[in-house]
Swiss-Prot record:
Its cofactor is Mg(2+). Transmembrane segments: none annotated. The keyword Magnesium applies. This is DNA topoisomerase 1. Its EC number is 5.6.2.1. The gene is topA. It catalyses: ATP-independent breakage of single-stranded DNA, followed by passage and rejoining. The keyword Isomerase applies. SMART domains: TOP1Ac, TOP1Bc, TOPRIM. Belongs to the type IA topoisomerase family. The record marks H32, R139, R140, D143, R299, R484 as: Interaction with DNA. Signal peptide: none annotated. One of its GO terms (cellular component) is chromosome.
């Protein structure tokens, strides 16, 4: 009977299968096989604690059946999901669905997908780590509770479609704080006195009449001119010359956060793009040695390096660069994060033999660029430090001192691989006490610059330093803030949009802990403690939930609505009120601002406008198109006095059936249809099925609600948008 190995991704399964004989079957779970119910909180909360309602997604039902059948036939079923909390939880859920005792499923882990790594993992299985599973469940429960309860409240007070979250709101607060700094910034004009001496020596005034000048201290132009006039009359000599040797230490190998930062700064990749490419390099690509993973696991906060990899790197350095570039012993790095999972490794090439040049015919251009970045950084991390000589010269007169600084490279060390953009700034050969002639003295004005907005790289750096989130959350958090229209990223700068200010203002006033970086970091520490079996996850949830829910209930009563609706300049035909534009989950519509006293809704131009020609047969009112969760229908605009409704007639000229995309409501075909004012997409089983979309549906499911996605252009950018919940994912331009 074959042994069964269960991994997460099909690409990973395919690569591993190449390393094993016919006695092994490898199948992918394709991510989480079950999750909290999407149509409610999904968690039962009572005096006994927090009990999840896990549901197998319909897209996974057949796959789960297949896994169960294969497991029944297998003599051993190995759980080989990623060795992080998310991977541990996926393995746990798979084992639970198969059935039987958890102990009967050996858990194997590896940090690289190479034949040796897989074979070694099979020799050293362990049990599923329930502490890690509970840490993941606690994170999932916390995120669901905050997202479900707080997002509903925010949406009710501002506008639908907005959300709040445990990590995303803390990150958004950082962006808002930066915007406030920029807005509050007042430029300061200050002056420096810059001297030009003989021998091409340039220096700046650092003290006057025995008083050290602080940076930006000289703000009076008249005073600066007076000092200039006095110092121009003085005689000067070399007061001191100081030379020091300084090392530029080698940078450590990459972990997730630093890889995202460097890829953003040096390659122009977004964090999401970086992780997507890194995932492919980890799971397996074609190489001269066959299909294999060429980098180690890319979601890590560890800087550990395997002993064998260190030896490979040192041998490579000695062979290619010589003994001068090889330190006496291997360099060891440690993460600043005290809860870093040190069992993991830093991100490195799986084989130092696979130089970037050897892969140029195998990898796509963007894959090669990222691999080259990882390869060079790892090799450089094991080289000698670069060595500089720093120089400083002080030129003095009776009333003041000027200072000049320079440096020159003595030994390039790791710069041999990574390069060095800093040019030497050499000072002339001088001797102490020698006189030197002042050729020119200038008073130069400078204006302080406002704080720079965050880039994706710098925001990740701050999130990491504050302990907000973990390596796996940085990229999704920034992407989520973009998709929610809280931020925009232009020319590598992150700026906040109007809705972000409103949300943060509410959270700061009523839910300060959600946007408090210290609270967020402490919660991450609690999750780390759960993973290390130092804390009970049910107790952590209780400690958070009940105070949080008290604030939710208070918020419902105390938070003033900030909903703002655009005026149309038209009057309501029913009550004389003002018609305004509003938004619902189905899009924009025009209604009376006296709602709920007046429920008038004006029919706007839509894809299906048969209502424009139809009057209510009961009262003579206008039949307008409305939407329910079952689709579109006609209703009298005199509701609630008249409650007449009618199904829409099917548009006869259905055209252009979309290949490979089925109706999410009934499974029927979807086709392009036309009305007098435009085209739309509808189900061919109409009127039995009322599915309708203004944008072309595609064969892709929403990650949030698992409804059908559509493709559209939004603000001149291509995007995929959920037809139901309007979750939007922008398609990235090719930066390669």
């Amino acid at each position: 009977m074959k042994h069964l190995i269960i991994v997460e991704s099909p690409a990973k399964a395919k690569t591993i299968k190449n390393f094993l004989d016919k006695n092994y079957e490898v199948i992918a779970s394709k991510g989480h096989v079950r999750d909290l119910s999407k149509f409610a909180l999904g968690i039962k909360i009572d005096e006994t604690g927090f009990t999840p309602n896990y549901v197998v997604d319909k897209d996974h039902k057949e796959l789960v059946k297949q896994i169960i059948e294969l497991s029944k036939k297998a003599s051993i079923t190995y759980i080989a999901t990623d060795e992080d909390r998310e991977g541990e939880a996926i393995g746990y859920h798979v084992a639970c669905l198969i059935g039987g005792k958890l102990e009967s499923y050996p858990r194997i882990v590896f940090h690289e997908i190479t034949q040796n790594a897989i074979l070694n993992a099979l020799k050293t299985p362990r049990k599923i780590d329930m502490s890690k599973v509970n840490a993941q469940q606690a994170r999932r429960f916390l995120d669901r509770i905050v997202g479900f309860k707080l997002s509903s409240l925010i949406a009710s007070k501002i506008t639908k479609g907005l959300s709040a979250g445990r990590v995303q709101s803390a990150a958004l607060k950082l962006v808002i704080d930066k915007e406030r700094e920029i807005k509050a910034f007042k430029p300061l004009t200050y002056f420096t006195l810059d001297a030009y001496f003989e021998s091409h020596l340039e220096a700046q005034l650092i003290s006057y009449k025995g008083n050290k000048l602080k940076a930006q201290e000289l703000i009076d132009e008249k005073k600066a001119q007076e000092i200039k006039n006095e110092l121009e009359k003085e005689s000067y000599a070399i007061s001191s010359i100081v030379k020091k040797s300084k090392k530029s230490p080698t940078p450590p190998p990459f972990m997730t956060s630093t890889l995202q930062q460097s890829a953003s700064s040096l390659l122009g990749f977004s964090p999401t793009k970086t992780m997507s490419i890194a995932q492919k390099l980890y799971e397996g690509v074609a190489t001269p040695q066959g299909v294999m993973g060429v980098i180690t696991y890319m979601r890590t906060d560890s800087l550990n390096i395997a002993k064998e990899a260190l030896e490979e790197a040192r041998n490579k350095i000695l062979k290619d660069y010589g003994k001068d570039y090889l330190p006496p012993k291997a360099k060891v790095y440690s993460s600043k994060n005290k809860n870093a999972q040190e069992a993991h490794e830093a991100i490195r090439p799986t084989s130092i033999i696979l130089e970037p040049n050897a892969l140029k015919d195998y990898l796509k251009p963007e894959e090669l660029r990222l691999y080259t970045l990882i390869y060079k950084r790892f090799l450089a991390s094991q080289m000698q430090d670069a060595l500089f000589e720093s120089q400083s010269v002080v030129v003095a007169c009776e009333k003041g001192e000027f200072k000049a600084s320079g440096r020159k490279l003595l030994f390039d060390g790791y710069y041999k691989i990574l390069g060095n953009d800093d040019k030497d700034k050499l000072l002339p050969n001088l001797k102490e006490n020698d006189p030197i002639k002042l050729e020119k003295l200038e008073s130069n004005a400078h204006v302080t610059e406002p704080p720079a907005r965050y880039s994706e790289a710098s925001l990740i750096k701050v999130l990491e330093s504050l302990g907000i989130g973990r390596p796996s959350t940085y990229a999704p958090t920034i992407s989520l803030l973009q998709n929610r229209d809280y931020i925009k990223v232009e020319k590598k700068q992150i700026s906040a949009l109007e809705s972000a200010f409103k949300v943060i203002e509410i959270l700061e006033k009523h839910f300060e802990e959600i946007v408090d970086s210290k609270f967020s970091a402490s919660l991450e520490e609690e999750l780390d403690n759960i993973a290390q079996n130092k804390a009970d996850y049910q107790q952590v949830l209780k400690d958070f939930y009940y105070p949080f829910m008290d604030k939710i209930e208070a918020g419902k009563k105390n938070i003033i609505s900030q909903k703002v609706h655009e005026k149309t300049g038209q009057s309501c035909p029913k009550c004389g009120g003002e018609l305004v534009k509003k938004n619902s989950r189905y899009g924009e519509f025009i209604a009376c601002n006296n709602y709920p006293k007046c429920k008038y809704v004006k029919q706007t131009e839509s894809a299906n406008d048969e209502a424009d020609q139809e009057l209510c047969e009961k009262c003579g009112g206008e039949m307008v198109q409305k939407f329910s969760r079952n689709g579109a229908f006609l209703a009298c605009n005199n509701y609630p006095e008249c409650k007449n409704t009618k199904s829409l007639k099917n548009t006869p000229n259905a055209k252009e059936t979309i290949e490979g995309v089925k109706c999410p409501e009934c499974g029927g075909d979807i086709a392009l249809k036309r009305s007098k004012k435009g085209s739309f997409y509808g189900c061919n089983n109409y009127p039995k099925c009322n599915f309708l979309s203004n944008h072309k549906p595609i064969n892709k499911r929403c990650e949030k609600c698992h409804y059908l996605m559509s493709e559209r252009i939004y603000r001149k950018k291509k995007a995929h948008e959920c037809i139901k919940c309007k979750e939007r994912v922008f398609l990235e331009e090719d930066n390669g």
